[in-house]
Regions:
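N-terminal "pre-motor" subdomain/linker immediately upstream of P-loop NTPase catalytic cores
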Residues: 19-25, 29
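A short macromolecule-binding patch
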Residues: 35-46
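Walker A/P-loop
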Residues: 185, 190-191, 195
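Canonical P-loop GTPase G-domain recognition
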Residues: 136-187
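Helix-rich effector regions associated with P-loop NTPase G domains
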Residues: 6-12, 24, 47, 52-62, ...
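Phosphate-binding glycine-rich loops and their immediate beta-loop-alpha structural context
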Residues: 102-154
Length: 300
């Protein structure tokens, strides 16, 4: 008798990860296969999860019971603690956020890139910029962008779907973990996923000539297996990132500020905004400082 059909009054739960949301159902992949090798189950949620206010997200580790192996159906009965979670989109246990922007077609807007990076920093996980369409620039120009981002506190990767080595570098970076792509539409996110996971063949769309924005082609959040290990999530695109309304959160979203504080720089006041306060211990000679000041004003 299999574990899910046991008559025990306290049935053993099977551990699995939520791979996708489909309407009102969860697609869960079991950590260990079922009696006939089944790994994927279409699951409902037990009412007690909803009554307890527990939202189940893609990426969650869950316990399932009530398995109907012939129909590949079950129910999610428990939710494990998360190492991290994103609210927009709803995604759990992410280890890296990959911010994808194009170096050309459309040309890279440093202010837009900065805002996407700040939005990604609100997740509290590692942020990695991916500079797509690198083949449309001279190598020196693409490398100059990587050097510029190093000054912002990031190790960026230049990528091109026609350059197998650059795709391999991304796959190596993602091996073993869970990562999510974000960034404006039209920068090649779906093309990148197709290159990383060739079996998917996600639909792509050309960039519109008038607005230089892409027509988004991803409709829902789903985890995809990477050939070298790890999981990758695509998210519905958006043209502007979301920044925190609370200006107190803003300073620590900048690696330029975090790195100075971690290196021992100290300010006289605990709530120093690093503007004109007396006793501010930070060096302000970094490229994005004026942008930081502007964002503080916007949040006021």
């Amino acid at each position: 008798m299999d574990r899910c059909s046991s008559p025990s009054p306290v049935p053993e739960l099977l551990r699995g990860r939520v791979m996708a949301l489909e309407a009102n159902y969860l697609r869960v992949r079991l950590e260990q296969p079922g009696p006939d090798g089944q790994r994927l189950l279409l699951c409902t949620r037990r009412a007690r999860l909803a009554h307890g206010g527990q939202q189940v997200m893609v990426g969650d580790w869950v316990g399932v019971d009530g398995c109907d192996w012939s129909a590949a159906r079950a129910a999610v009965a428990s939710l494990e603690p998360r190492s991290s979670h994103l609210q927009r989109p709803a995604l759990a246990n992410v280890e890296q956020v990959l911010v994808v922007v194009a170096l050309a077609q459309p040309s890279l807007d440093p202010e837009l890139l900065s805002r996407f990076l700040l939005s990604a920093e609100t997740t509290g996980v590692e942020v990695v910029p991916l500079l797509s369409k690198a083949d449309l620039l001279e190598p020196a120009a693409a490398q100059a962008w990587c050097e510029r981002l190093r000054g912002w506190g990031y190790e960026a990767l230049c990528i091109s779907q026609s350059n197998g080595a650059s795709i391999a570098a991304v796959q190596q970076r993602l091996a073993g973990g869970v990562a999510v792509l974000c960034g404006p539409s039209g920068v090649g996110k779906s093309s990148l996923i197709n290159a990383l996971v060739p079996t998917l063949e996600l639909r792509t769309a050309a960039v519109s000539g008038k607005l230089q924005r892409g027509r988004h082609t991803t409709r829902h959040v789903e985890l995809h297996d990477l050939p070298g290990g790890g999981l990758l999530a695509d998210t519905p695109g958006f043209n502007r990132p979301q920044l925190p309304a609370d200006r107190q959160q803003l300073p620590l979203l900048f690696p330029e500020i975090r790195n100075q504080l971690e290196a021992g720089s100290r300010c006289r006041f605990r709530d120093c905004r690093h503007l004109t306060e007396p006793g501010c211990g930070l060096d302000r000679s970094w490229e994005r400082y004026s942008s930081y000041c502007q964002l503080l004003q916007e949040a006021s």
